[in-house]
Amino acid sequence: MKINFMIMISLFAGSMVSAQDSLNTISGKPKFIAFSPSKATKNVNGMLIKYYDEIDQEIQPKKVNGVGLGFNGLGIFFPVLFLVNITSINNWGINDIGSEPLPDKMNTINGMQLSIVNMEPTVTNGLELSLSSNISAPSVINGVAVSPLYNFHHTTKGVAVSTFANVSQKCRGIQVALINVCKDSRGIQIGFWNKNEKRKMPLINWNFKNKKL
């Protein structure tokens, strides 16, 4: 009798949890911990765990108020390729990075993005800590971006700090790295070699004037 009663309680509890998950999915209620890719993940107030990235055409935009964690294993190989090709850095097509227009569908993270690599278009409002930055993903940082290797963004508003390179289409703030590149800049570049729309200079470069049409 007791066993039957416990089984009934367990089944009832399981059905309640399942029903609650279904309601959350239907209502779009924010989740505290969510995983991606998942059709059920749209709004997160807490932590998003992303185990691989969706391609641009398939991305389902997600809004995260909290922390976004990216564990895409492909990011481990980019540092290796970087180190192998470090001697040919002058031949890199870094001027093309970030030249794509921002897509209509983008993730939004209000808080912190911590990842091995990000390959989904993302707007980060806060802190971005990444090993291999944003690859094949036009992204925006409003705040601070830090990487032990390089930062690649479409738009940087704030501070970008890395060891080797910061590359952006549009910059409003400060870039600090061995090499800094920005096509539309309002701010300061500090590094061994710096390039903006007006000039190329070692050590320090700047521009505070609007681009002439």
For each feature predicted by the language model, list its residue ranges:
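Surface-exposed, glycine- and small/polar-enriched segments that build interaction surfaces at terminal
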Residues: 20-213
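Bacterial Sec-dependent N-terminal signal peptides
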Residues: 1-23
